[in-house]
Amino acid sequence: LHAQLNLLKDAGVDNVAIEASSHGLDQYRIDNINISAAAFTNMSRDHLDYHKTMEEYFKAKARLFKEILPKDGLVVLGIDTIEKKYLKQITDNNKHNIITIGRSESDLQILQLDNLWRHTALRLRVNNQEIDIKIPLIGEFQIHNALIAAATVTVDKHIGIIESLKTLETLKGVKGRLEFIGSNKYDAGIYVDYAHTPDALEFVLREMRKYTAKKLYLVFGAGGNRDIGKRYLMGQVAENFSDVIIVTDDNPRNEDPLKIRLDILMSTKNAIEIGNRYAAIKTAIDQLEEGDNLLVCGKGHEETQEINGKISHFSDHEVINEIYK
């Protein structure tokens, strides 16, 4: 990472935004980087195959704020998506400049959020002003992330918060994050998302429900050689928040794909099991009718699939476009 940042500097790049992974933080790979601002978007179950407990997972994330970010640095916190016990540990006994964002009382407060077709309309309060903006994204979690990003760049004193928020109206969504791919002949929507944890899956299904008049279809699986405990939980989420479930392979890696699918199926009642991901997606698309939506989860932007240690080209986007067109 340090070598790549040095190359960027030599190329004339002055500012960089990076994701500080919990693995990287725990392994001290982010240390000695000149960081001006840090954002904490959410805290939910993930990477427990590595960290073992939520406490150790948080401890790794917290290093960014407690040990790496300078005392005069900017901290941006999404207060709706992080438990208070974690927020308190980040904000207590430090001298950081802090910007909070959320629906409850905060520095950047969401007063109103209206879900429109492929857009979200917002009324916000910031600096004792109320402003209205329309962001070309759906999904409240995506809106929170966009607002956090807009606040974080104000660490550059030449960028005002109102100006930064207004630029969100021209934002292009991230590939594979609640991304609309297209619709079939019945105008049923087909979406792709990277959700691969219980919380993320619940968030995205709850959001999709707002735009689904009839049945919400879900195609998903779980990664191999990762946290086994989340598979049962993801099955529960699928059962509670979708109408038609097809359990398929994600990236089994070196695990038995059938074993992974069975771990998920233990908490579902009427799920369909189709190991081949292409066949699973096709089965779902073929069943879609007017008023339905399909969400294909787990791989998002990825363009490969790993089965039995072999990596092959596979893109949910390409498969969907090939099938429905």
Question: Where on the chain are the PLM-derived regions?
Answer:
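Acidic, Mg2+-coordinating active-site environments of NTP-dependent enzymes
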Residues: 11, 35-190, 265-267
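Inter-motif core of Ras-like GTPase G domains
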Residues: 31-43, 213-218
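Conserved helix/coil segment N-terminal to the catalytic DExD/H
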Residues: 23-31
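Local beta-strand N-terminus motif with an aromatic residue
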Residues: 13, 35-36, 72, 216, ...
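ATP-dependent carboxylate-amine ligase
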Residues: 92, 151-176, 180-325
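Short beta-strand segments
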Residues: 19, 42, 78, 219-221, ...
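Conserved nucleotide-sensing/catalytic segment adjacent to the nucleotide-binding pocket
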Residues: 1-21
